[in-house]
Design a protein with these regions (language model features):
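Class I SAM-dependent methyltransferase Rossmann-like catalytic core
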Residues: 1-17
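Conserved SAM-binding loop
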Residues: 15-16, 20-122, 134-137, 208-210
């Protein structure tokens, strides 16, 4: 969880979009799990992961068949809120995971996602995907879900729609701050080269809220 991730989650809390009962997918790392925070705020929350952890109530592989998942969670479902934060990039079949999570949501429930669109590789244990805005838009269309456009954001930059161009979803430009940025820019100008970090940021995550219709 980055600072921008936390800001996004706090925004959703302010808007009262995170409600009981809630499931956090990927809660094994106790330093970044939201289970204690939500429970302390009166939002009944349980955690799940592939391995044991302080805030893991159920060990579940969400890439498995939904028939194997439902019996594990039968006493808790359906959920009003499911959070899947910084998980999808570490899976082989993110669509299978999303399909399973949607089936665990109540009608009108919220699926909250955060995943990188541009980010250095970081295996945990594997790193497979960088999901673009069009992926979420198409998925929501095919599964009859509604994306809140005001909350469909490049975290730390702004709404995804504000960066769209004809025939392109668009990426935020790098934040132009810090001595290193200007030093690097000068060096690239002297040697007539193009620095990748001057074309677009190499740390971009997308946050969004999908509602089950």
């Amino acid at each position: 969880m980055t600072n921008e991730d936390h800001k996004y989650i706090n925004l959703l809390l302010e808007k009262n979009l995170i409600k009981s009962s809630c499931l956090e997918v990927g809660s094994a790392e106790d330093w970044c799990s939201l289970v204690p925070k939500f429970n302390n705020q009166g939002i009944k929350t349980i955690g799940s992961d592939l391995s044991k952890g302080k805030y893991v109530d159920h060990i579940i592989d969400f890439e498995s068949d939904i028939k194997d998942i439902i019996p594990i969670l039968q006493d808790e479902t359906p959920f009003q809120t499911i959070l899947c934060l910084n998980v999808l990039e570490h899976t082989f079949n993110p669509i299978q995971i999303l399909d399973n999570l949607i089936q665990l949501l109540d009608s009108g429930g919220k699926l909250i996602l955060i995943a990188p669109a541009a980010w250095p590789l970081h295996g945990y244990p594997i790193d497979c995907w960088r999901l673009m805005p069009d992926f979420y838009t198409k998925y929501a269309e095919l599964r009859n879900l509604t994306i809140d456009k005001n909350l469909f954001r490049y975290l730390g930059f702004g709404p995804v729609d504000s960066y769209k161009k004809p025939h392109s979803s668009g990426f935020p430009l790098p934040l132009r701050k810090g001595l290193y940025f200007y030093y690097s820019k000068l060096i690239h100008k002297i040697f007539n080269t193009n620095g990748r970090n001057h074309l677009f940021s190499n740390h971009i995550a997308i946050g969004l809220v999908m509602t089950k219709n």
